Amino acid sequence: MGDYLLLIDGSSLLSTQYFGNLPREILYAKKQEEKEAWYHKIMMTSKGVYTNGIFGFLRYLFKIIKEQKPAYLAVAWDLTRDTFRRELYADYKGNRSETPEPLREQFALCQEVLANMGICQLMDEHFEADDLCGSMAKKFESQLPVKILTKDNDYLQLVTDNTTLWLMHSTAEKTQEIFDKYHMKKEDMAIPDRVFPFNPQLVEEEFGIEPCHVNSLKGLAGDKSDNITGVPGVGAVSAVKLIKEYGTVEKLYEAIDNLDKAGEKAIKEYWKEKLDLKRSPLAYLLKESDTELVGKKAAFLSEKLATIKTDIPITEPLEHFRTHIDKAAAQKELDRLEFHSVRLDFDEEEQPSVFETLELERVEDMNESFEVIRALKKEKTLGLSFAGTKDNIVGMAVAAGTKGYYFPVINFITEDLLTGFADELAASCKTMYVPDAKQFLHYMTDHK
């Protein structure tokens, strides 16, 4: 792949891993008190420190470092919602619920762990993670390729010929749908699991506009996830057509401001014929109010809120972000967090385990899990490994020849179900390899 700079939205990745590794009881609980009643089942250390998000974060990070081998690496964080955007609009992200306490506790701890390992991090109370990544990309993309890893599609506006967005999806199936749509093969690309790589051409094909106009699109259509209103009355389809035609909110209003009745009629007719806008949004775009955020005022404010900054001063040279992990310090952190199943395996001369050389297919559906286990019971030789802390199982990996599967503890796939599967497989196969026999027996005995 060659040298490149990898920028990771740490807040996005940690949150994704937290929710992806929650007990099913919390995922399906409707009321907050019902969720809190099951907090004791969240993965934690023997001292009661929540670690499920960090566990997934580090596993994912180590896998990327081993397989994608970024020459340079930085993790960016949101520290607060009270950034400069709240100064522009007090209700920015005002529709979001409070961060769950078990997740909130893990942000500072994850940042501390990464710092102790020697991984470069970016954080500033006045800016968001995307602003820091945007400024890093702008500074260094002329020197080498940049990859940005996140689940947030706001980052699409940063995509250029030398900056690729690795957009994460919640399931492998959703990712595969996009690969199939564009007749692309993931196997031909060196990218992480559940990620689709967006370049400028793919952004335009998927969203109908160039990357540099994504913020302007949100200026008209808004963004519910960030409580950005856009222009009330202007829908997403109309917004795409208008931005594709005019490029920016400013240029759109240059075309429609100060029109007389004849001019308004003419532009409505033009939009109808050229842009196929059967219901003209002109009245909504020109609406004015002293009490409501509408029309031009809403459009310009929304565009500004949606614009990722790319001009934050980055004083460190590229070499400062050279990928390096202090392996002794990292192992100390893994021991502190009681992550006995997470391995540091970055050096090519080291012999990786079977699970680190296989692309594991994630199995999250209970019915599918039974089907896969039935097929695996026909194999004579298997490799099996549990993932988790000292006392909690968060998943199980099974390898058979060149195929591998990962069963996370999620939805109706429980710890007891996985140990039951392990029992069945151990009884059916002739030979079973387990990387950590002591830990394997501990899990099996504890969940009888």
Please give the residue ranges for each predicted region.
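Structured, non-catalytic alpha/beta "coupling" segments that mediate domain-domain communication
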Residues: 65-76, 80, 145-157, 161, ...
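Short active-site loop/helix that positions an aromatic residue
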Residues: 14-20, 156-161, 396, 437-448
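A charged helix-plus-loop insertion that forms the helical arch/lid used to bind
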Residues: 29, 80-107
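Extended two-metal-dependent nuclease catalytic cores across DNA- and RNA-processing enzymes
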Residues: 40-44, 94-314
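Short, basic/hydrophobic alpha-helical segments
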Residues: 57-69, 135-139, 415-429
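Active-site-proximal helix-loop-helix substrate-binding element of RNase H-like nuclease domains
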Residues: 120, 174-218, 358-359, 397-448
